[in-house]
Amino acid sequence: MASPLSTTALSLALLTVITSACASDTDKRSQAEAGRAPKLSAVTSFQIRSEILDDERTIHVMSSPDVFLNDETQFFIAQDGRLFFDETTTFQGQSLELSATLKELSTLSKTANLAVVAVNSANQSGQGFLDNTKRYAEYFPKNAIDFIDNPLERLGYRLIVDRKKNNYARFVVEELIPTLESEFQIDLNQSNLGIVGMSMGGLIGLSLMLEHPDIFGSSIGLSTHWTGINFTDYLLLPIRGYIGPSDSTAQALIAYFEQFKSQMSRKTVYVDYGDLGLDAYYEPYVMRLKKILETDDSRLCVLKFENEGHEPQYWRKRLASALSWVQHGDIRCS
């Protein structure tokens, strides 16, 4: 299958964003022969035209300082790409300041050989009702819909969520990953590829790892949104400004994840949550999911953070330690 990434668009993006950091074509070839791709010292941004999503997505790639990308680099595909860099069009006008996180990791007494591939979500405006609906539809695991007991709720998910243009998981596996492998001269698989997300981004991340265990070896979810949405609240959201959880959706997600317990072999999963706002609903479901995800030969970290909620300011504080734990197992999880 031909790469969905336009060669012209990528060339222009590379020349515009990181001209000084990229080698010449000749240097690229020699580096490839030596088993390493060009070093990135800034954010590389380019666009992919997705046939699956029928949309164009901006991709941002950033690595730790002084790291040459190769098969030894730990790559993380991250949802809600704008949230990592641009506070002007993100939830609550805040960003995770990824560059500061990577610098923090590089100063630790260990190698932080990692790169983050941040994919912009369908939420172009950062706050629009329709944009948020499409983002939710893309990030909700499609195969979990079968486990929703309420027939009306299940029908709603079938009509709104389960559509070809909302299949973000297929986009990641069939379009994004082959593009990254081609551009950066790498082979991505469970030994060097993880996935990270916040809220709904954490939900689709765990789903991707479990449905594609040969591709993803780790998953990081910060304040993963386990409880879905109450459809009545959601339809009235523009008026009421409030949205509550759906226990039936949460139960469906637990049943969906339970079928993958055998896929947890040799997997690494980080899950955290707070006790404010939406996060206050999560603990009962997290405890049940912990029993599903915990196996003899898996690595699982589940952490609760007191007085923290469903906001980027809290995720920003926790991102570095989550990434470091996946690579080095250097924080206490209890």
Predicted regions and their residues:
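Sec-dependent N-terminal signal peptides
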Residues: 8-16
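Detector for intrinsically disordered, low-structure N-terminal pre-sequences
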Residues: 1, 16-17
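C-terminal motif of bacterial Sec signal peptides marking the signal peptidase cleavage site
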Residues: 20-21
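Bacterial N-terminal signal peptides that target proteins for export
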Residues: 1-9
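Non-catalytic cap/lid and distal C-terminal segments of serine-dependent acyl enzymes
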Residues: 26-334
